[in-house]
Each structure stands twice: as structure tokens, then as C-alpha cells.
């Protein structure tokens, strides 16, 4: 009887931890996680490898010292691809700026990793250029300087239907892809993604939003825009669809013109200009991540995506994955110290940061 119990326990333990899913700080399966790689700040003593971690079971950030560690969170999750079974697993790495080729400025501005077996898998959205490598996990030295974002969701294999459609709309550029025949048969749109085939010329719908459930039943919303949408995914799609004011952190250091804070009668989307992350203050110019947080406690949305708020990206594909989680929302909302206000006097800036609330109360003149 004792031997029988040990064998049963061993099978359950091995199977539970052997699932292809997002991995936590201990390398164990988790429903979803967020990682914020901190920028290299000489005055604060950060090396550019430190990160903070939050998942479905967290109440606050957990600090990590080395984003390059293959055994925790991002590293443990991505490393599953390198040991995957080619005949039985689907995998996909995509990037507009991958480790193999020069940057692509025509197709979608999007970066991610996905891996599935016949039951479950994960989708990881990230902002890191030249990442991940094709043979084994490592984090590029060139991406240590700026802040970066990661959002991973574990999901059942049937959601490859929605993911394939999402990748087709955003024109995700594959640099590693493996589609066994059983996946190609069940999810034929994956072959369109592999062949870089996008929407037909007859298409009239240039954006989609789809609910996707994690393995634990959390509903996420995936938003995708094709380049012919010709608009800002944050303001023209996510803010308007959810009827919320957003603060968006994105890369605004490029050569293209910035869109700037957008305030209309139907939506407001503010560019973040200054942040405080776990006690570290830094300007948006130190950050390459792409995320948004709502200003609504009744609709506490946090989104992680592909797109910068620059005019050149209006005519490129890209997406975002959004989650409603009050603990995560409170953390991200508290990050925002300053946003660019509405320019027009006819629109009152609706995003209330810590700085604006304290200033309005007469407690501080400037933070």
C-alpha cells in the first residue's frame, strides 16, 4: 500500500510540474505572470538585470536579481521551447527585431513567444529586441539599459484558434516556428501565420478583440490591429472599447514623431512621463516597455502590448493583452507619477496620478 501511494503521488507531482505553462520564480507552473525588468540606473545602483515579478497568487512584487537566470520566471518559461518535442509540440517565436535578421519596419511591431502541447501552453508578450535566442536561453546585454515588460498567460490548446487569428491580424514575423501536422489540421490559420499571409484584399475589418481564458479561468482580452486600421491601438481601440481613460508607457525615444496625449470627447489616453517602480524614480525615456493602466477602480484594467505611441506605428500591426486584476492595477496605477496632460483647454485631464492628487490637495507643488 505504501509503495502504491508513493507511485501515485510521484505521477501527480511530476505531471503537475511538467505541464507546458508559464513558470513562476521557483520554476513551477503558474496561471499568469508579469515581469518588469528595471532600467540600468547608475544613481540607484541597478545593473539592468534586476526585475520585479507578480503573478496570479501574488499580493505584491517579488524582487529578482538576474533576468538572465534560466530557472526563474521568464527564463524558465522560454527555456521550455528549447527542450520541446518537435513532432508533438507547436512553438512560435516572433519579432520585428529578432536575433537573426535586421529589424523589419514593414510588418507588425510585435514580439512574443508561444509553446503548446496537445493540452496546454503559454503565450508570452514582451518588449525586448533581439530576444529570445534560437538555441538556448539568455538575455541580451543590449537590452539591459532600458526597462522592459513581459506578460505570460497559461491557456488550454483550443485557444490557438484565437491566437492564430491575432497573429495574422498583427502580421507577426516568425523567426522560429514549428507546426506539426495535427496542429496545422486543427488550427489552419497557423500556416497563414508561418507563410506571412495576412488579411485578404477584400477585408473590411482591420481590428479584432477576443476573450481568452487562462487555465484557471481568468478572462483576458486580446486586441489586435492590422496596419490598415491606421490608428493608435491604445486610444482608438482599447480606451474607446472599454470607455476608460488610460495612462500608457511606451517607447518615445525613436526618430518618429510622437502622437502625444490624446484627449477627445470619447476617449483620453495620456503618455506617462515619469514613474516610480518599487522605490525607483525614472523618466519614461529610460523605459522600453509597453503597457497601459486604466484610471477606473470599477474597471481596473492593465494591458501589455506591442505598440509605441508614435505616428509611424499607426500604419503598422500590433496588439495588446489586457487583464482585470485589482492588486495588479493598484501596483501599476501607483507607478504613474506624471503624465502629459491634455493640450486643449476644452478637455480636462481625467487621469489622476499621485502627483496631481497631492498637488490638488495643496500638499506638494511638484513631485
From Swiss-Prot:
Disulfide feature: none
UniProt keyword annotation of Signal present: yes
Positions of glycan attachment: 253
CDD domains from the UniProt entry: PLDc_DNaseII_1, PLDc_DNaseII_2
Enzyme Commission code: 3.1.-.-
Gene Ontology process terms (BP): apoptotic DNA fragmentation; negative regulation of antimicrobial peptide production
Signal sequence interval, chain numbering: 1-18
GO molecular function term, any single one: deoxyribonuclease II activity
Keywords tagged on the record: Glycoprotein, Hydrolase, Signal
InterPro entries, A to Z: DNase_II (IPR004947)
Domain of life the protein comes from: Eukaryota
Ranges that cross the membrane: none
Name of this protein: Cell-death-related nuclease 7
Annotated organism of origin: Caenorhabditis elegans
Amino acid at each position: 500500500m505504501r509503495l502504491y501511494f508513493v507511485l501515485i503521488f510521484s505521477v501527480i507531482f511530476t505531471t503537475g510540474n511538467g505541464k507546458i505553462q508559464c513558470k513562476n520564480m521557483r520554476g513551477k507552473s503558474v496561471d499568469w505572470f508579469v515581469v518588469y525588468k528595471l532600467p540600468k540606473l547608475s544613481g540607484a545602483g541597478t545593473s539592468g538585470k534586476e526585475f520585479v515579478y507578480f503573478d496570479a497568487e501574488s499580493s505584491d512584487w517579488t524582487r529578482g536579481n538576474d533576468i538572465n537566470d534560466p530557472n526563474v520566471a521568464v527564463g524558465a518559461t522560454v527555456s521550455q521551447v528549447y527542450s520541446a518535442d518537435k513532432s508533438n509540440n507547436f512553438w512560435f517565436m516572433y519579432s520585428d527585431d529578432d536575433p537573426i535578421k535586421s529589424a523589419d519596419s514593414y510588418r507588425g511591431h510585435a514580439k512574443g513567444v508561444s509553446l503548446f502541447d496537445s493540452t496546454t501552453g503559454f503565450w508570452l508578450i514582451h518588449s525586448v529586441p533581439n530576444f529570445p535566442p534560437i538555441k538556448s536561453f539568455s538575455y541580451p546585454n543590449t537590452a539591459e539599459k532600458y526597462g522592459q515588460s513581459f506578460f505570460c498567460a497559461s491557456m488550454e490548446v483550443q485557444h490557438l484558434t484565437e491566437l492564430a487569428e491575432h497573429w495574422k491580424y498583427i502580421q507577426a514575423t516568425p523567426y522560429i516556428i514549428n507546426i506539426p501536422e495535427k496542429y496545422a489540421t486543427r488550427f489552419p490559420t497557423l500556416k497563414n501565420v508561418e507563410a506571412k499571409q495576412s488579411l485578404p484584399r477584400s477585408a473590411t475589418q482591420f481590428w479584432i478583440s477576443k476573450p481568452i481564458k487562462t487555465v484557471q479561468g481568468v478572462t483576458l482580452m486580446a486586441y489586435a490591429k492590422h496596419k490598415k486600421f491606421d490608428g493608435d491601438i491604445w486610444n482608438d481601440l482599447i480606451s474607446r472599447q472599454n470607455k476608460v481613460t488610460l495612462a500608457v508607457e511606451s517607447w518615445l525615444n525613436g526618430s518618429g514623431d510622437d502622437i502625444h496625449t490624446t484627449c477627445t470627447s470619447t476617449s483620453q489616453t495620456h503618455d506617462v512621463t515619469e514613474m516610480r517602480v518599487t522605490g525607483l524614480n525614472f523618466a519614461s525615456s529610460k523605459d522600453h516597455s509597453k503597457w497601459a493602466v486604466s484610471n477606473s477602480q470599477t474597471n481596473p484594467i492593465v494591458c501589455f502590448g506591442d505598440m509605441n505611441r508614435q505616428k509611424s506605428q499607426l500604419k503598422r500591426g500590433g496588439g495588446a493583452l489586457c487583464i482585470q486584476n485589482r492588486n495588479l492595477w493598484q501596483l501599476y496605477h501607483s507607478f504613474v507619477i506624471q503624465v502629459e496632460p491634455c493640450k486643449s483647454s476644452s478637455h480636462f485631464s481625467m487621469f489622476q496620478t499621485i502627483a496631481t492628487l497631492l498637488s490638488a490637495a495643496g500638499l506638494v507643488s511638484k513631485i
